[in-house]
Amino acid sequence: MKLRKIFAAVVLFLSAGTAMAQQMPAIPVDKNVKIGRLDNGLTYYIRHNSYPEHVASFYIAQKVGSINENDDQRGLAHLLEHLAFNGTDHFKGNSLQDYLQSIGVQYGRNLNAYTAVEKTVYYFTDVPTTRTTAVDSCMLILKDWSNGISLTEDAIESERDVVHNEYRMRIVGQQRMIERSLPKLYQGEKYGYRFPIGLMSVIDGCKPETLRAYYRKWYRPDNQAIIIVGDVDVNHIEAKIKELFSGIKVPKNAAKIEKVEVSDNDSAIYVIDKDKEQQVDLFQVYMKHNAVPDSLKSNMSYLLKGYMDNVISSMIAARYAEKALEPDCPYLQANAGDGSYLISSTKDAFTLTGVAKPGKIKEAYAAVLREAQRVHEFGFTATEYQRAKDEFMSQVDKALANKDKMKNEQFTTQYVDNFTSNEPIPSVEEESQIWKMVVPNLPLEVINSYAKQLVCQSDTNLVSLVMMREQPEAVYPTEQELSAIVKQVRAEKLEAYVDNVKQEPLIAQAPKAGKIKKTVENKKLGFKELTLSNGAKVVLKKTDFKDNEITFAASANVGYSTFGKEDFLNATFAADVLDASGLGDFSSNELDKALAGKQAGVSFSLSPFNHGLKGNSTPKDIETLMQLIYLKMTAVSKDQKSFDNMKSMMATVLANKSNNPSLVYQDSVQSTLYLGSKLARVPEA
């Protein structure tokens, strides 16, 4: 596609608004992926990728998930996923896992599957491709997963207990509350009853033939995609797909995959829940709106929407983070972004999320709403938008620089989403060109106009979910109180946000340069060792792991084991405190603003026996990296606001540690291994 055509469409979009979206050109599809469809409807994606060499990833994506279950089938999609590993036409019993492990594929790490609301995906990765017979056997596994899962009675019976165990591990704390809340959040509609884990009563009681009927109904080639990416012969793979899959028939009068719509809510919905295992008081405010239909996602307007969502989320998150540093801020952290409403694909929502300080849930709810309302009324500033653009383009440049070092899973994930929901798949080069034309020409006025639309001003499609710690002394908000807060915030007279930016260099005066006193070259291992005039030793090594990336580490052989017991906790958290501090004349918040768009960062490290720094940058930003290293070593400055915020966050989590199963388990193991020593246990709040 001609870039001039894209640019003309962008100008049209900016001048005429979103009504012109449908007239914009299509997003180009990456020409390096071979996409085809067999006569029976099966779709395939094949891409040669030699990073890393001699391995490939094999996927089969099913355009079916828990939303396709009937009321008496809740959990069958998930149970069926488990049974794909317990016997197929060509791999009886556990021989599928045994075979893959024999060629180096490990179950859990390289071999797995997942069931979602609207898709089920099976995969195995890092398969050696030097033997054509191994590749062909892997193709046969995909064929069996398509229409050859055995579903024997013995396998079904044994897998019921496995699903029970998974349910016990997953449905804890916050997950429990979400599952309880979904029916009300979806006003009794189907999405409210289709959490993928399902009902254990269905898992226990379903007859084998019921599961087989579900399998035959939905696991069909017209609902499936074969995705293979790696160091393979594309033509051989395509021929093998045609050979293995062309003969699979689609039943007459096959059931259609139909989108399930989500109704608007005329009045606000408020759900308040509590759980003993919940670690923090958390709330989410959803402002619902229609999702972009799959049919329009290949349109350039969808790409523009994604960019606007990205920068809006970035800018409002920065405001929330800055506000959280104030001593009287009632929340610990907050963010916002536009995306799917809970688990549905047909309804989106601009979602505000906040974690309240203990006892401050209502105040935090108001504060998070207030900042969103401020965006609605005044929008963002030019300096905020410039930082967001710089950060966005920095990521674009990074992706372009590493386009030849993309791993297989970066592609397979894209192709799964393209098949199941028509997400665009342009090449990195084409997308980079688009952004380099679009971003400089998309004005702040358009961003602010779009942001204004996202923050709703009526109770229609407003939904709030509050999930709190269950404690004897806790006071929980009521629906009436939350509704009153919404009305109050909307009626407040707010002032526009003022973006205070420090217009100074990171280092006011460059330090006096030292000298290289000695250079030793190790040709065998390919590095140079420099000895500087201050005694520091520097090892330089050129690598080709990633293009356009520089990594850095500095280490000294003294760690927190040298500190006394009274300083142990201070030493344990020292690296976190130092990283949250300011540098030179910059507070941590001012530093974040100054580094926007830079691919450079340095952090402290502290272990029992070592301390040091680690970081990374690009060649373009290596000067910034060096400045940060120098400041981390010489000019860490106290930032009381940042320290207090971090301390409050840690205290909130640790105060409820006795109700956190994973922390209790960790504490018990550490206490046993180290004979009850407090130095090894989870800290007290």
Residue ranges and their predicted role:
Residues R160, L211-K242, L462, D667:
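Non-catalytic, conformational "gating/processing" segments within enzyme and secreted inhibitor domains
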Residues F85-H90, L151, D233-N235, F245-P251, ...:
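Bacterial peptidoglycan biogenesis and beta-lactam-recognition machinery
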Residues I203-L211:
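Alpha-helical scaffold elements lining the catalytic groove of polysaccharide deacetylases
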Residues A116-V121, S158-N165:
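Short, structured secondary-structure elements
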Residues Y45-R47, P52-E69, L76-L79, N94-D144, ...:
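M16 family metallopeptidases and their MPP-like homologs
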Residues M1-Q23:
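Bacterial Sec-dependent N-terminal signal peptides
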Residues A21-I46, D233-A317, L325-P327, Q386-D390, ...:
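Proteolytic maturation boundary segments
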